[in-house]
Swiss-Prot record:
Name listed for the protein in its UniProt record: Tail assembly protein Gp25
Reported function: Promotes tail assembly by creating a scaffold for the tail tube proteins. The tail assembly proteins Gp24 and Gp25 would wrap the linear tape measure protein to create a tail assembly scaffold. It would allow polymerization of tail tube protein during which Gp24 and Gp25 are released and therefore are absent from the mature virion. The tail assembly protein Gp25 is produced by a rare -1 ribosomal frameshift. The ratio Gp24/Gp25 is important for proper tail assembly.
Biased segments, Basic and acidic residues type: 236-245
Pfam families noted in UniProt: GP24_25
Family: Belongs to the L5likevirus tail assembly protein family.
Keywords assigned: Viral release from host cell, Viral tail assembly
Organism whose genome encodes this protein: Mycobacterium phage D29
Gene (UniProt): 25
GO BP term, example: viral tail assembly
Assembly behavior: Interacts with tail assembly protein Gp24 and tape measure protein.
Region (Disordered) location: 221-250
Length: 274
């Protein structure tokens, strides 16, 4: 994976950490644009969707005869979409939008809207914020636990008003969390996977191989008058547990219990017959 940090990147991280995204409208009026991670989940989703909508607007072919009309139409559409974002992230959205709308030329106005949006995206690390927000929404508890256990980092510091952790820094830590931790276990399906890395699976395979070898040895040297030794069971793996363990009280659980009782009864009868 590409290294996220360079010396220049560290320098920018330190500088930006203390600088809010502030847009000056006049000498005495400023508007702050909140980072994505400080929005509620629904607001975050709406912002991400709006940004994606802007990015998906196709380029205009300058050779197209209708290009002039399309440019104005696209410009108005861009302003409309970006205004939705400003209403969610700006502390004074009406003043910001009114200031931008003072420009009469729709093309220049659209460029102004887009420039403010791009500035916010860069300064707040939107890409990393979006990825991190999605992970926190799905696996927040596990990430909180792992960051504290492995790095001594409190995830809540990401949301502090003063000296917050940067999204890029936290995302980098999350990406490189150990595979044996709670985060990767949750991504794979649940905490039953915790601790199960390549080494654990290899040990389970070795255990099964040794048990199988012992069983073959017992079968080759057994007394034919005595019952056959039971075949060894495979070492339980989280994948098997997830597939074969039905919910207590469910119909599947009752079927499993009935089959187990019938099998045990049959084994007792065979043992008594011999």
């Amino acid at each position: 994976m590409t290294n996220v940090f360079t010396i220049d990147a560290f320098r920018e991280e330190v500088k930006k950490k203390y600088e809010p995204v502030t847009i000056g409208i006049s000498e005495d009026v400023t508007v702050e644009l909140k980072p994505l991670l400080k929005l509620g989940q629904k607001a975050r989703e709406a912002v991400v969707e709006a940004v994606k909508e802007v990015e998906d607007i196709p380029d205009i072919d300058e050779d197209d005869e209708e290009a002039e009309e399309l440019v104005d139409e696209y410009s108005l559409r861009i302003c409309e979409i970006v205004a939705k974002v400003f209403r969610l992230i700006a502390t004074k959205p009406k003043k910001l939008i009114a200031a931008l709308d003072e420009e009469e030329d729709p093309r220049i106005r659209a460029e102004l809207y887009a420039t403010v949006l791009r500035t916010w995206m860069v300064e707040t690390q939107l890409g990393e914020s979006r990825a991190l927000a999605e992970l926190i929404d799905k696996f927040g508890g596990a990430i909180l636990s792992d960051l504290s256990e492995y790095h001594g980092v409190d995830l809540r510091d990401l949301f502090r008003d003063e000296d917050p952790l940067s999204p890029r820094y936290v995302l980098n830590l999350v990406i490189h969390l150990p595979k044996t931790g709670a985060f990767y276990a949750e991504r794979r399906g649940g905490q039953q996977y915790r601790g199960w890395d390549e080494d654990r699976y290899a040990l389970a395979d070795i255990y099964d191989a040794v048990q199988a070898g012992n069983h073959i040895l017992l079968m080759a040297n057994r007394d034919p008058k005595k019952p056959k030794p039971k075949a060894p069971k495979a070492y339980p793996r989280p994948d098997d547990f997830e597939k074969t363990t039905p919910k207590p009280g469910s119909f599947a659980a009752m079927v499993v219990a009935a089959k187990k009782a019938a099998r045990e009864k049959r084994e007792r009868e065979e043992a008594n017959a011999e």
